[in-house]
Amino acid sequence: MGNTTTKFRKALINGDENLACQIYENNPQLKESLDPNTSYGEPYQHNTPLHYAARHGMNKILGTFLGRDGNPNKRNVHNETSMHLLCMGPQIMISEGALHPRLARPTEDDFRRADCLQMILKWKGAKLDQGEYERAAIDAVDNKKNTPLHYAAASGMKACVELLVKHGGDLFAENENKDTPCDCAEKQHHKDLALNLESQMVFSRDPEAEEIEAEYAALDKREPYEGLRPQDLRRLKDMLIVETADMLQAPLFTAEALLRAHDWDREKLLEAWMSNPENCCQRSGVQMPTPPPSGYNAWDTLPSPRTPRTTRSSVTSPDEISLSPGDLDTSLCDICMCSISVFEDPVDMPCGHDFCRGCWESFLNLKIQEGEAHNIFCPAYDCFQLVPVDIIESVVSKEMDKRYLQFDIKAFVENNPAIKWCPTPGCDRAVRLTKQGSNTSGSDTLSFPLLRAPAVDCGKGHLFCWECLGEAHEPCDCQTWKNWLQKITEMKPEELVGVSEAYEDAANCLWLLTNSKPCANCKSPIQKNEGCNHMQCAKCKYDFCWICLEEWKKHSSSTGGYYRCTRYEVIQHVEEQSKEMTVEAEKKHKRFQELDRFMHYYTRFKNHEHSYQLEQRLLKTAKEKMEQLSRALKETEGGCPDTTFIEDAVHVLLKTRRILKCSYPYGFFLEPKSTKKEIFELMQTDLEMVTEDLAQKVNRPYLRTPRHKIIKAACLVQQKRQEFLASVARGVAPADSPEAPRRSFAGGTWDWEYLGFASPEEYAEFQYRRRHRQRRRGDVHSLLSNPPDPDEPSESTLDIPEGGSSSRRPGTSVVSSASMSVLHSSSLRDYTPASRSENQDSLQALSSLDEDDPNILLAIQLSLQESGLALDEETRDFLSNEASLGAIGTSLPSRLDSVPRNTDSPRAALSSSELLELGDSLMRLGAENDPFSTDTLSSHPLSEARSDFCPSSSDPDSAGQDPNINDNLLGNIMAWFHDMNPQSIALIPPATTEISADSQLPCIKDGSEGVKDVELVLPEDSMFEDASVSEGRGTQIEENPLEENILAGEAASQAGDSGNEAANRGDGSDVSSQTPQTSSDWLEQVHLV
């Protein structure tokens, strides 16, 4: 039994169908035990009997195996099915007992394999869950991703290919080499089969095909120009003349003369005609037309169907010239002075001048030969009547008449600014540029704005610039294109081969000079990242100084120390050398940077130019490809398909490639790092992507893309091209606007709420004013030398609108004099000269703080809480009834204390913004009131008044205070304000006092400039507002002992030294006795935000 099985296997492997059939039929036991789906094992690459039968195209055995439950979907070690092996042909060679190659394959083998393939395609296997039967996998792929159609196409088996395609084989399947079945046939030189597959692929049916082709048919393919042939020019001229004549009710000759005088512009003619028709005709060399006769719809235009047209019109001339027979005998020619024969056809001129026919012919021939065909006037002296065209045609010969028509068309084109001749030598075509109408729809192609130098085509493929008549260079204008060509001439790019490498070398050299120093011995670059000035070269072991680059042995105590260098001359020389080298390296780097930038644009410019030259050949091959596809499809389906889409796609590709080529010179001259350039480059990249996609689909020996996909790609490229040109015509993007002044907000919403502002905009306005004020801090000289800007708005204009109501939200008050008085009295009491000297470091650190930092503002607020400011008993009781601030957006809990009715909720403490506004007001007052110098400050009476607010350290009242209070931040700030602006603190008026512009403060000397327009406004929600309102005044501020002291101080300043002593006696222990001793006392009085 084993010998029979072995013999049968060998017969299958060798392809001996007769021996295999004989063994199989003569051994019933083999027939019963043989399973066609059983693998022969690894030595035979796991092929089954069905694989070998399909490989050699054994019809009888293959049919038998399929009838005995053979499964053609079984796979071998290469993941190949029986259909793969059937379509392979004799090219595959398998060693050692596997498939042996056959040197020759007869033609009958193709038909036999086609029969085997048909049997496999008709095979039905087990019933599946969906009620269908298992079928042979026609698109099964092996390890190399080849389908049976790939192998059939590579083998050139046309019958098998047709069967596979008919049963739905995938024409677009790609193997691991990205080859389709058409590509496989092409590589094996089966050209007819490849062409057949190409036609099947291109004209394959798809659900999207009809929709895309409908869009392609509806696509507006018009361009903003029109190529005109000579007959088109003649028809355009005649149509324009006829329409104008019909509109003006004038003869054709008159209409032509009017149009010629107005540059063939109908709108221009109508404007002149409506203003003065007689003057318009006179300047054009024609007479004013009369109304047409009855039976005619216009002068010499279309005849009426009811009235026959006569050979000669009796109304040719406005002046009806009637000559008697006696006069005809005596008429003379005005040129030759000979009698005009009666037998000659008369030449009737509208002006009435008579000349013989011979003189007319000689005169007209001379004018036509001179090229003045469009302005031939009457030969009479001082007559400017134009000779009608019908007279010229009736007098001159046919050959001369032909030349006249040529000159006439030439004059029509040259006098029409909307038409230009094609500059290509030997081309007789012209181009008409379509004018863009303002009433065109936005979706119309012609509604796109025209470029300054559009590219036009005469219809023969001759592209040229409309403006300069040179090479087409849109989107560049003529001057930009000229500059680009000049740049190429100057740069000589053929000599700039290694620009990129040189640019990198220059950049490296600049970096080394900027970040390193050369060794003084071996000149190797050394970078210092840590350590002292004693350097040792790692290459030559040379010890040198990093500062002066000289030998380290020269350094000792004479140079400032062993690890310091104070050798000024040497250091100066080294720095000059380093600076010169750096400047030279920067120049070199900048030059190579410019060269590298030019090479970037020039390289891409040349790449697109080279691609354009290669793709121009597709115009010739596209026509051949169209004929081949039509012929191949006609043989298979019998129809003649539309193949013009290939040529259209090539034209779209060439137009876009040319625009991309010229877009790089346009981008080269754009402003670097501008919004306009960024938008341009984005659109340019987008256009390049769709263009390359279309090029891959079209620029192939065999098309492998369906027709509808090629059409879709071409439509997309055309759309992107039009959008790109329209964008460039509009200027790509508006000019970059200047950057507006930035007003930064705080990090989160809680910042401006926590700091007491009603909105982020109010906080931004505050920050802006803080940045633009005078920021010099220091002594009195620096304050007095920086007066405020007269154009800068005052605090009142910034905080209070014109209507008089505050812009702040409820619960946020402007600083009042009363509250500031309490604050000053409690803070400045703690300041003494001794304490100021002890806290000098704190004051220096404070002078460098940034007031705009929210963290600093928060620290000031917290310092208020810890400072324990003094308040009188009445004020403390009033503040204890403070309402909750949680309702205004703070993160603090609401107060549970009861709030007295009919009482406004005061603010417990100053917000950070109010504290900083206080500092601004103090500085502004100090700058405006500058009556003193630092020398006279101590001797002025104001210094005596200062002692009321700032008692000395020897004062017994101040000696008994807690020294820890002097360490708080707020006390230091107030002390600093006091030292810098001593006069400003004394000048703060009470809330109930308005300072007029004419009044002068007591601390100002005679002749000095007074403080003008100083008014402190108290809002309705002030913290010390009294319930009683007197008639004629606003809300009154609760009296305060410190206010009385200030008023007393003012009166004392006016009265003299005695008043100052009275003011000193007026201050006193009342304020100091109100000061809380601990922070807890202050927390009980004030609810701090």
From Swiss-Prot:
Binding site for Zn(2+) 2: 351, 353, 378, 383
Protein residues bound to Zn(2+) 3: 465, 468, 473, 478
Coiled coil ranges: 575-640
ANK repeats: 45-74, 144-173
Entry-linked Pfam families: Ank, Ank_2, Ariadne, IBR, IBR_1
Any Gene Ontology biological process: ubiquitin-dependent protein catabolic process
Residues the record lists as binding Zn(2+) 4: 519, 522, 537, 540
Residues engaged in binding Zn(2+) 1: 333, 336, 356, 359
Active-site residues from the entry: 532
Xref: PROSITE patterns: ANK_REP_REGION, ANK_REPEAT, TRIAD, UIM, ZF_RING_2
Molecular function per GO: ubiquitin conjugating enzyme binding; ubiquitin protein ligase activity; zinc ion binding
Domain UIM: 851-870
Annotated GO CC locations: cytoplasm; ubiquitin ligase complex
Enzyme Commission number(s): 2.3.2.31
ZnF region ranges: IBR-type: 401-478
Compositional bias ranges of the Polar residues kind: 931-941, 1070-1082
Residues holding Zn(2+) 5: 545, 548, 555, 565
Enzyme class, UniProt record, top EC level: transferase
Region Disordered: start-end pairs: 281-321, 776-821, 889-912, 927-964, 1026-1089
Lipidation (N-myristoyl glycine): 2
Keywords: ANK repeat, Coiled coil, Lipoprotein, Metal-binding, Myristate, Phosphoprotein, Repeat, Transferase, Ubl conjugation pathway, Zinc, Zinc-finger
Zinc finger (RING-type): 333-383, 519-548
Ranges of biased composition (kind: Low complexity): 303-318
UniProt record similarity statement: Belongs to the RBR family.
Protein name in UniProt: Ankyrin repeat and IBR domain-containing protein 1
